[in-house]
Amino acid sequence: MKYINKLEEWLGGALFIAIFGILIAQILARQVFHSPLIWSEELAKLLFVYVGMLGISVAVRKQEHVFIDFLTNLMPEKIRKFTNTLVQLLVFICIFLFIHFGIRTFNGASFPIDALGGISEKWIFAALPVVAILMMFRFIQAQTLNFKTGKSYLPATFFIISAVVLFAILFFAPDWFKVLRISNYIKLGSSSVYVALLVWLIIMFIGVPVGWSLFIATLLYFSMTRWNVVNAATEKLVYSLDSFPLLAVPFYILTGILMNTGGITERIFNFAKSLLGHYTGGMGHVNIGASLLFSGMSGSALADAGGLGQLEIKAMRDAGYDDDICGGITAASCIIGPLVPPSIAMIIYGVIANESIAKLFIAGFIPGVLITLALMAMNYRIAKKRGYPRTPKTTREQLCSSFKQSFWAILTPLLIIGGIFSGLFSPTESAIVAAAYSVIIGKFVYKELTLKTLFNSCIEAMAITGVVALMIMTVTFFGDMIAREQVAMRVANVFVAVADSPLTVLVMINALLLFLGMFIDALALQFLVLPMLIPIAMQFNIDLIFFGVMTTLNMMIGILTPPMGMALFVVARVGNMSVSTVTKGVLPFLIPVFVTLVLITIFPQIITFVPNLLIP
């Protein structure tokens, strides 16, 4: 059983390394040997579909898919147990339908993939049913634990029997499922989309993982309207992962993990300490400065909070800082990551909005620096008021030694940005280069990274990627419903009726995102609302590069605000303190962040000037 439990991890880790090698070969073939590989990109995308699906399966087993629990946490224990049982039942149905639709799309696939020697696209579509069967097995494993620990009323045997019965019906009497077509009984017309959206909100807020709730709502819509087109729509579940720009996401995740395991994080922190530690509020400045440097390599807010957080909080405690400020600064400074290039959030926005990722990278730099300086100013004020001690000023020799040890790590952002703008590699390939560079530094320079650690890091990155992959798949499916019913256009018409200028629209959008960010995870929020907000921005002639940076900053504020502020929970965990302590500490640091948001909203040129200058 031990080896079976590791099946996805070993297979996914091996495929992850295979993609890594293929894309490194692609860069070398083009830049060194001047002979591009025509098959590498297509093969990498095909393997990524499997990596993403295997990651979803791992997250099902560990029950790590993104969900909203603030309402269920308020429920009495018996009601919460009943609600959790309902949630598990809905997830079970989703996985069964993944298998069902996966088989149908696999059988219908016939086109060749020319870049891979004409092999059938069935190889891509096979990922959905094959891995979904594995998901079902993992789901039943998880339910065994849930029943034993009293989290569910339904034992695993119930789901096993249900699965056997449903598969028997599927293979021997598939027409029986036609009774589930609501359109056979009720004709709701254009109201169907509103029913689907209402159901989506209800099941999402009772704890159904966000990705699965999107899938259920969309299927409900199709059952009320156009079930005959559902097969074509479900093809998008797989095609949504068959995207080259999305390959950057898992490799920036991997880079952040490798920085922690390869000794890079500690050296970045020590350099920031030698540079800033002797000023008033020095250790707070070190915390913020280290986050700026770290963000230039990992591109993730929570990677910063989790990777640097423990190190930063310990150093601040040792220097005499109160826990609330230790936690508050650590949480607040982590939002620099998604703004300063490279940025996972910017990559996702670029894919959704079909905008230049290189431009987005550059556009986020100035706001990132502004927030860094603003947080340092607030830290200085608090440190002076509370009388925190300074650390002794480092000597020139100590500063040089610290710089020498961290030099190769600090070089990473310059390598990434320089490579993109020199044309050596694309923004997607920059993630591969960053990960490869982290391997080289960790293995051969700092000598703290082993091959076993590298493989385990790939497995961890694959598992995190699975959470993102489910969101990408189901939000694309959900987007088909939104597009068919022109929901984005309807929302835009409401904005047009209320707003009289682009600034008014931006204020309304900021207010909406700030409110939603209190309850919905930033990643989920990005996938859910951007497809509806981007058309509104276009209708008011708002620059989409500016819009991407503004919405990214806004959503990052969401990870700092309760009750769903993920950074608060991560920092509380790594710092061994209560969430309320972190929340208390982060409140004063929200002021400079809000001021920066207002500033860039009123003066978008702060964001657009540099990218327009460098990339006409």
UniProtKB/Swiss-Prot annotation:
InterPro entries: DctM (IPR010656), DctQ (IPR055348), TRAP_DctM (IPR004681)
Sequence intervals crossing the membrane: 9-29, 36-56, 83-103, 117-137, 153-173, 196-216, 244-264, 288-308, 332-352, 357-377, 407-427, 431-451, 459-479, 505-525, 527-547, 552-572, 587-607
Result after altering A29S: In strain: NTHi 2019
Record's keyword annotation contains Cell membrane: yes
Location, primary (coarse class): membrane
Annotated stretches, region: TRAP transporter small permease: 1-190
Cellular compartment(s): Cell inner membrane
CC terms in the record's Gene Ontology section: plasma membrane
Keywords, sorted A to Z: Cell inner membrane, Cell membrane, Membrane, Sugar transport, Transmembrane, Transmembrane helix, Transport
Comment field (misc): Is essential for lipooligosaccharides (LOS) sialylation and serum resistance.
Subunit comment: The complex comprises the extracytoplasmic solute receptor protein SiaP, and the fused transmembrane protein SiaT.
Primary role: Part of the tripartite ATP-independent periplasmic (TRAP) transport system SiaPT involved in the uptake of sialic acid (N-acetyl-beta-neuraminate). N-Acetylneuraminate can then be incorporated into the lipooligosaccharides (LOS) as a terminal non-reducing sugar, protecting the bacterium from complement-mediated killing by normal human serum.
Descriptive protein name: Sialic acid TRAP transporter permease protein SiaT
